[in-house]
Regions:
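Blade-level signature of beta-propeller repeat domains, shared across WD40, Kelch, NHL, RCC1
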Residues: 337-385
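Short loop/turn segments that connect beta-strands within beta-propeller blades
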Residues: 67-70, 110-113, 187-191, 229-234, ...
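Ser/Thr-rich, Pro/Gly/Ala-heavy low-complexity intrinsically disordered linkers and tails
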Residues: 1-44, 383-385
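A short beta-strand motif characteristic of beta-propeller blades
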Residues: 71-78, 142-146, 192-198, 234-241, ...
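Short loop/turn segments immediately following the C-termini of beta-strands
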Residues: 57, 100-102, 110, 178-181, ...
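An edge-strand/N-cap motif at the start of beta-rich repeat modules
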Residues: 27-74, 170-176
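Repeated scaffold domains used in trafficking and secretory/extracellular systems
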Residues: 31-43, 82-90, 126-168, 201-211, ...
Length: 385
C-alpha cells in the first residue's frame, strides 16, 4: 500500500490496515487457503474484490475501476433501454448488482473467467475500459438482468451467503432491493425474485444487509422510517428516523445501522432502540472502516471520520469538491464520488493524500460500491420492538 499512488509498495508508510471483521464484531474471518493468499487487511486475496463500481447515471452505464491501479477495466450498459443506474452493491466474489431508479437490476461478473458465452460470437466479448462500451446483449460479463416495473427501484444490497471452509468462500448470496413500496429478495445466481414483502414502505431510498443477511432499509417517504426485514421469516420491524433524518445508510461492524447526510451521522442503538446523532441533516452516503470510524462528507467535500462510539470527528480529509458517495476499499482508502460530475477521489485517511479518477459521466452512487461494507458488517440480536 502506497498513499502516493500506483499500488506500489512503500517502505516508509504502510498506510491504513484493517483486521477485517472477526472477534466480537461479528465480521467474517477469512482463513487463507492454499494457493489463495490472505490479502493484507484480512480479506481474501481475490483480485475481484479490488474494484469500485460507480454508476455513470447520465450515460446509463457503470464503471469497474481497479482500486489499486485506479484504472477503469470495464464499462457496462446497465439496462436494455433508458437506463437510470444509481446504487451499486458488491458481493464477496466482487460481482456487482446495479439498480436502475426507473426499474431493473443487472448483475455483472467481476472476474472475466466467470463470463459466459451468450452472444453467438466465439470467445468472450466484454468491455476493456472507459471508451469500450458494448451494445446491450453483447457484453458477456452480464450475468443476468431482471426487469422490474417500478416508479422507484433504488436500494441494492447483497447478502454474504453461506461460507464454506471446503471452498474457502461464500455461495448462495442473495440480493435485496425495493420496488416502490415492496421489498424484494432476488436469487443471486439467476436474478429470479424469491420473496416479495409487499407494501411496507413509502419511498425506499437505500438499504444495506447486516452480517446475517437481514435487510435494513431507509424509507424517506412520509414521516421517514428505518425498516428491518428478517432474512429467515421475513418479519418486518420499523422505527422513526432520528432527529436529523437520513439519506445514506450502512451497517457497521457491530451490526448497528447508520444513516447519514449533510455532514451528520446517526447511529441506531439496537439495545435501546434509540438514535445518537451528530451534525446537521442533508444528503450523501457513508461507510465505516470496519473498525472504529464512519466516513461521510459534508457539503463542501470535507471527508469526516467520526468515531463510531463517541461520535467525535477523529480524522478528516479535504477533497476538491462535494462528494455524494463515500466508500472504503479493502486497502483502507476512502473514496468519494462526485455529485453528477466526472470525478471520483481516493483519499489516504492517514496522510491526507488524494488521487483523482476523472473519466466518469454524470456519476451518482453512494452505496456499498466496493463490497467492503458487506464484508465488515456485523450482526446483533434484533430489537424486541
Amino acid at each position: 500500500h502506497n498513499p502516493s499512488g500506483g499500488g506500489q509498495d512503500s517502505s516508509d508508510h504502510d498506510g491504513p490496515k484493517f483486521d477485517v471483521g472477526g472477534g466480537e464484531t461479528g465480521g467474517p474471518i477469512y482463513e487463507p487457503c492454499e494457493g489463495d493468499p490472505k490479502r493484507e487487511g484480512g480479506a481474501r486475496g481475490e483480485l475481484a474484490l479490488s474494484y469500485i463500481w460507480i454508476a455513470n447515471t447520465s450515460q446509463g452505464t457503470i464503471s469497474k475501476i481497479n482500486t489499486q491501479t485506479m484504472v477503469e477495466e470495464g464499462r457496462y450498459i446497465a439496462k436494455p433501454l433508458g437506463g437510470d443506474p444509481s446504487r451499486t452493491s458488491v458481493n464477496l466474489h466482487g460481482d456487482v448488482a446495479v439498480a436502475n431508479r426507473n426499474g431493473g437490476i443487472a448483475k455483472f461478473w467481476a472476474n472475466p473467467e466467470d463470463c459466459q458465452e451468450s452472444n453467438g460470437i466465439p470467445g468472450i466479448q466484454t468491455s476493456s475500459g472507459t471508451a469500450d462500451i458494448l451494445p446491450w446483449g453483447e457484453d458477456e460479463c452480464l450475468a443476468w438482468y431482471t426487469e422490474l416495473t417500478c416508479g422507484s427501484n433504488r436500494p441494492a444490497a447483497w447478502t454474504r451467503g453461506d461460507y464454506s471452509e471446503a471452498t474457502c468462500g461464500y455461495s448462495g448470496a442473495q440480493l435485496w432491493t425495493a420496488c416502490d413500496t415492496d421489498v424484494l429478495l432476488l436469487n443471486g445466481e439467476t436474478g429470479a425474485i424469491e420473496q416479495t414483502i409487499p407494501g411496507i414502505g413509502s419511498f425506499f431510498y437505500g438499504g444495506a444487509a447486516d452480517g446475517e443477511g437481514n435487510f435494513w432499509g431507509l424509507d424517506t417517504g412520509g414521516v421517514g422510517q428505518l425498516l428491518r426485514v428478517d432474512i429467515d421469516d421475513f418479519g418486518v420491524q420499523t422505527w422513526p428516523l432520528g432527529p436529523i433524518g437520513g439519506y445514506g445508510i450502512t451497517v457497521g461492524p457491530q451490526g448497528r445501522p447508520w444513516t447519514c447526510g449533510g455532514g451528520g451521522v446517526s447511529r441506531f442503538n439496537l439495545d435501546t432502540e434509540t438514535w445518537d446523532s451528530v451534525g446537521a441533516g442533508g444528503i450523501g452516503g457513508c461507510m465505516t472502516d470496519g473498525e472504529s470510524v464512519i466516513w461521510h462528507s459534508d457539503g463542501a467535500g470535507l471527508l469526516l471520520g467520526y468515531d463510531i462510539e463517541t461520535l467525535q470527528v477523529v480524522s478528516q480529509v479535504q477533497l476538491p469538491e462535494y462528494v455524494h458517495g463515500v466508500s472504503v476499499d479493502f486497502d483502507g482508502y476512502v473514496w468519494g464520488v462526485g455529485f453528477t460530475t466526472t470525478n471520483a477521489y481516493r483519499a489516504d485517511p492517514i496522510t491526507g493524500d488524494v488521487q483523482t479518477f476523472d473519466q466518469l459521466v454524470g456519476a451518482y452512487t453512494y452505496s456499498d460500491m466496493t463490497g467492503f461494507a458487506l464484508n465488515s458488517a456485523g450482526s446483533a440480536p434484533p430489537p424486541e420492538g
